[in-house]
């Protein structure tokens, strides 16, 4: 938290691994979304998601968005940064 506050990043990614038989997850997140997250951050999540989807589609890689991993609890690795000025994202990889 101290380093985050000193650096004030514009983008923060929380990377995770899922089961080997899973696909990939990236923003936009599932509902509910914390109502205190600014619209500009939510717009950024959508833009990152569109960019990711375009590349995944281009190469025929399976993925999903908005089905899991909400952005509500303020202590998540994506919501806390989003509540503190960064575009906070969770990525799950197979």
Positions of PLM-derived features:
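Structured catalytic-domain cores with a bias toward divalent-metal coordination
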Residues: 1-94
């Amino acid at each position: 938290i101290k380093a985050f506050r000193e650096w004030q990043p514009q983008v923060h990614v929380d990377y995770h691994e899922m089961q080997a038989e899973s696909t990939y997850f990236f923003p936009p997140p599932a509902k509910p979304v914390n109502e205190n997250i600014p619209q500009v951050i939510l717009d950024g999540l959508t833009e990152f998601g569109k960019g990711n989807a375009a590349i995944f589609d281009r190469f025929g890689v399976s993925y999903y968005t908005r089905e899991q991993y909400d952005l509500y609890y303020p202590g998540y690795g994506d919501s806390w940064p989003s509540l503190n000025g960064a575009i906070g994202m969770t990525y799950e990889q197979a």
